[in-house]
Design a protein with these regions (language model features):
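Structural signature for extended repeat/solenoid scaffolds and their inter-repeat hinge/linker regions
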Residues: 1-169
Length: 169
């Protein structure tokens, strides 16, 4: 009998399903089992292109949520910054990788992140999530390099130090 409870079973099942169906299955599995955590959502959704995210959403099948991954996430995740990040990814509003880089926009993002991360107070996570989740990988690399130049700190480490609960996500 085939089971998906073992790591091998999960890998075999994912390979059999194919790239987007397996991601939809993982996105569907996270809330059904206690042993699965937010990592499944992160691995299956975050950082994907809009096209890939749309394909994963199209492959999501769960009658309880009328085949809507957005409804599933809204109902199953607690109302916190992680849900905001996942919902932003599901909105398919991420910059495309082939979009030309805008130096002024990158400088503006670095300044906004600097305002959030370099002040002593907490807060600003929602704005930070909005920036990071919706930018392309190329944009994020340029932003991280400029952040290092301006603030002489690693952007990822600054985010972890500022918002430990977001860094886990």
């Amino acid at each position: 009998m085939f089971t998906t409870s073992s790591p091998f079973g999960k890998v075999a099942f994912a390979v059999a399903l194919g790239p987007y169906e397996s991601e939809a299955w993982f996105a569907n599995s996270w809330y059904q089992k206690k042993e699965t955590r937010n990592e499944l959502l992160i691995e299956s959704l975050m950082g994907r292109s809009n096209k890939e995210t749309a394909q994963i959403k199209a492959c999501f099948k769960d009658a309880k949520y009328n085949a809507s991954l957005e409804k599933c996430v809204a109902d199953e995740l607690p109302a916190n910054k992680f849900r905001i990040a996942v919902m932003a990814q599901l909105s398919c509003s991420r910059m495309e990788e082939d979009r030309p880089l805008d130096e002024a926009g990158i400088r503006e993002d670095v300044a906004r992140l600097g305002t959030i991360l370099e002040r002593g107070a907490t807060g600003g996570e929602t704005e930070m999530v909005g920036i990071i989740v919706t930018r392309s990988d190329r944009w994020l690399r340029e932003m991280a390099a400029l952040y290092r130049q301006v603030y002489e700190r690693d952007l990822a480490k600054a985010i972890i130090k500022h918002s430990k609960n977001l860094a886990v996500c």
